[in-house]
């Protein structure tokens, strides 16, 4: 029997979010719906999840000592990473001491580093992946390029949202790509992965939930990326029955190997009936924000249910739906939004994240839409996002 204590009382069930961005905010909201006490930890003040958490802390989460200190101070029942830039070795140690890391510390450690998850997928599980090599210095990079050939993608093994990532078409671009990769890593310069290009029809995110009542899948989510970050996502992505079956098999193998209960965002390339593994996040995925309007249980609700040990049951997908990001470009620490009345027709919703500032481009919200077809939903969501005016 699962027992949930009431927030701010001695028997409270406490959830600590490591990362307080827009995804963490939605996880916090789902915890609040169940009366759970929420502590948000982030690397900058006034982050979105901090607005609604019972308490919050600002620390460098790559500092293992600082991470241990805040966890020992708050004594959470569940430690829920929302970002990759965390001292994962400390999470492993804390888990060994009896703390509950979601889904588990090993999954967080492996997926923070592209080398760990790629070797697990390709070498341990023998899943189909792109051709790849790792390089720790410039000399190793030359050897990796010789083995993979042009064109290729270079990425820091520790980065996210496209940071440090480049498409390299010829040798003239190699030096700049290497330098960019060294600047883009979450923990500073370091090892990179060199990946051969994959011929694919489209990419999907397959939200996969490992729960007390088994493994569950959301309908596949298609998405468009630009500069390494998502711009629109939609659900369901049409694909053949065989490809969908293969995608679910790969996703189940990956999340089972990683271990722990929770929701995982499994990224896959689809080419006809063939499926190639790309990456996985052991947490809600940004492309999955479409589930805020497309399903009866969003990816955030599913994650919370799973890590609490509650059953998932049946996930109901309502039909064609899409999300489109609100991505302004300006300098401001006093942002305002207008034009919302033009973005809220029937079948449309807006989420504004409440980020405190921006310097250049930053994702500040998302438009959500349902429609008769996926294509129409994408158009409606993009138009709604464009209707929101951001000033500051």
Swiss-Prot record:
Which Pfam families does the entry link to?
A: ATP-grasp, PurT_C, RS_preATP-grasp-like
Quote the cellular component terms of the Gene Ontology held in the record. Answer: cytosol
User: Which Gene3D superfamilies does the protein's record reference?
Assistant: 3.40.50.20, ATP-grasp fold, A domain (3.30.1490.20), ATP-grasp fold, B domain (3.30.470.20)
Q: What is its EC number?
A: 6.3.1.21
- The residues covered by the ATP-grasp domain are 119-308
Q: Where does Mg(2+) bind?
A: 267, 279
Kindly list the organism's lineage.
Answer: Bacteria, Pseudomonadati, Pseudomonadota, Gammaproteobacteria, Enterobacterales
**Record's function text:** Involved in the de novo purine biosynthesis. Catalyzes the transfer of formate to 5-phospho-ribosyl-glycinamide (GAR), producing 5-phospho-ribosyl-N-formylglycinamide (FGAR). Formate is provided by PurU via hydrolysis of 10-formyl-tetrahydrofolate.
Hey, which family's this protein in?
Answer: Belongs to the PurK/PurT family.
The positions annotated for binding ATP are: 114, 155, 160-165, 195-198, 203
GO process annotations (BP): 'de novo' IMP biosynthetic process
Instruction: Please give the pathway this protein is involved in.
Output: Purine metabolism; IMP biosynthesis via de novo pathway; N(2)-formyl-N(1)-(5-phospho-D-ribosyl)glycinamide from N(1)-(5-phospho-D-ribosyl)glycinamide (formate route): step 1/1
Q: What is this protein called?
A: Formate-dependent phosphoribosylglycinamide formyltransferase
| Species | Sodalis glossinidius (strain morsitans)
Keywords on record: ATP-binding, Ligase, Magnesium, Metal-binding, Nucleotide-binding, Purine biosynthesis
Gene this chain is encoded by: purT
Please tell me which top-level EC class this enzyme sits in: ligase
Q: Which cysteines are joined by disulfide bonds?
A: none
State the superkingdom: Bacteria
């Amino acid at each position: 029997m699962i027992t949930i204590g009431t927030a701010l009382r001695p028997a409270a069930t406490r959830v600590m979010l490591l990362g307080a961005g827009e995804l963490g905010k939605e996880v916090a909201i789902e915890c609040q719906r169940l009366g759970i006490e929420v502590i948000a930890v982030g690397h900058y003040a006034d982050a979105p999840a901090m607005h609604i958490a019972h308490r919050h802390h600002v620390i460098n989460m790559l500092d293992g000592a600082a991470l241990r200190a805040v966890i020992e101070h708050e004594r959470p029942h569940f430690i829920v990473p929302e970002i990759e830039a965390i001292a994962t070795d400390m999470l492993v140690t804390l888990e060994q001491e009896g703390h509950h890391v979601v889904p588990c510390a090993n999954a967080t450690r492996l997926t923070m580093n592209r080398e760990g998850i790629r070797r697990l997928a390709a070498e341990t599980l023998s899943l189909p992946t792109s051709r790849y090599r790792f390089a720790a210095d410039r000399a190793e990079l030359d050897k990796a390029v010789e083995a993979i050939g042009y064109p290729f993608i270079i990425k820091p093994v520790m980065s996210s949202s496209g940071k440090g990532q480049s498409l390299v078409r010829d040798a003239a671009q190699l030096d700049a790509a290497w330098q960019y990769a060294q600047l883009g890593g979450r923990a500073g310069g370091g090892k990179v992965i060199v990946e051969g290009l994959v011929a694919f029809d489209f990419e999907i995110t397959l939200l996969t939930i490992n729960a007390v009542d088994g493994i569950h899948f959301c309908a596949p989510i298609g998405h468009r990326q630009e500069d390494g970050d998502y711009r629109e996502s939609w659900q369901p992505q049409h694909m053949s029955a065989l490809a969908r079956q293969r995608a679910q098999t790969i996703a189940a193998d990956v999340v089972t190997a990683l271990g722990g209960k929770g929701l995982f965002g499994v990224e896959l390339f689809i080419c006809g009936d063939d499926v190639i593994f790309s990456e996985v996040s052991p947490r809600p995925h940004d492309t999955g924000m479409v589930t805020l309007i497309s399903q009866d249980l969003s990816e955030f609700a599913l994650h919370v249910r799973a890590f609490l040990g509650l059953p998932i049951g049946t996930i109901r997908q309502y039909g064609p739906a899409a999300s489109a990001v609100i991505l302004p470009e300006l300098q401001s620490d006093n942002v305002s939004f207008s034009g919302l009345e033009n973005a809220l027709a029937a079948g449309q919703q807006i989420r504004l994240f409440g980020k405190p500032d921006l310097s250049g481009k930053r994702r500040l919200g998302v438009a959500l839409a349902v429609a008769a077809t996926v294509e129409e939903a994408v158009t409606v969501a993009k138009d709604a996002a464009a209707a929101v005016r951001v000033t500051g």
